[in-house]
Amino acid sequence: LEAAIMDVVTSASPPVGRTRAVEILRGGRSKVVAQYAYDALAGYGAFAHLRSADVLGRVDEMLAAGRLRSTGGRFPKLRAA
């Protein structure tokens, strides 16, 4: 899961925040996912079997451990640390 999170964070363009990364990993079908072709990313839908809260929890663990960082601001984006 951590490798997939890191892959989404580093390959998504434009960059994504916590909840969008979770949406991509769980295979969400929002307009934004289609608009920016996030559904073409390797990790798209790979963790559809997990609850959103579980995937988000892992993202938060990676932030706390310093493996990811947040840009901050009103719409924070994730970056590899």
Task: Name each model-derived stretch.
Residues 1-81:
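Accessory DNA-binding and partner-docking regions appended to nucleic-acid-acting proteins
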